[in-house]
From Swiss-Prot:
This is Succinate dehydrogenase subunit 7B, mitochondrial. The gene is SDH7B. It is a peripheral membrane protein. One of its GO terms (molecular function) is protein-membrane adaptor activity. It comes from the Eukaryota. Residues 1-32 form a transit peptide. It is found in: Mitochondrion inner membrane. Component of complex II composed of eight subunits in plants: four classical SDH subunits SDH1, SDH2, SDH3 and SDH4 (a flavoprotein (FP), an iron-sulfur protein (IP), and a cytochrome b composed of a large and a small subunit.), as well as four subunits unknown in mitochondria from bacteria and heterotrophic eukaryotes. Residues 9-19 have a biased composition (Low complexity).
Length: 100
């Protein structure tokens, strides 16, 4: 019972303290306000012609990703085939050993 009274007093204290601070500018919005980027931020976000040659081109990147995906599928299929062949060979060897 003391725990419930303690919780009630804590919550009432928090409610009263938050109602007293409603005049503060910081308590109006916890997320803050949107501010426009300054000149330094705008300069950092602007395109730089010196870096343009390092920019990856969408078509070539898309092709490279596609080739990587195909190679991944081929490797996984090859591994699955190897496992299947080993299992079949083992099964045949056991069957041949039992029959002789």
């Amino acid at each position: 019972m003391a725990f419930l009274l303690n919780n009630a007093s804590i919550s009432s204290h928090l409610r009263s303290s938050s109602s007293q601070k409603t005049g503060d500018a910081l308590s109006i919005s916890r997320r803050g306000f949107h501010i426009e980027p300054g000149t330094r931020e705008k300069a950092l976000l602007a395109e730089d012609s010196a870096l343009k040659r390092f920019k990856s081109h969408k078509k070539s990147v898309h092709k490279l990703k596609r080739i990587g995906d195909v190679l991944t599928v081929v490797v996984v299929a090859g591994c699955c085939y190897e496992i299947y062949v080993k299992a079949v060979m083992k099964k045949e060897a056991l069957a041949a050993g039992k029959s002789s």
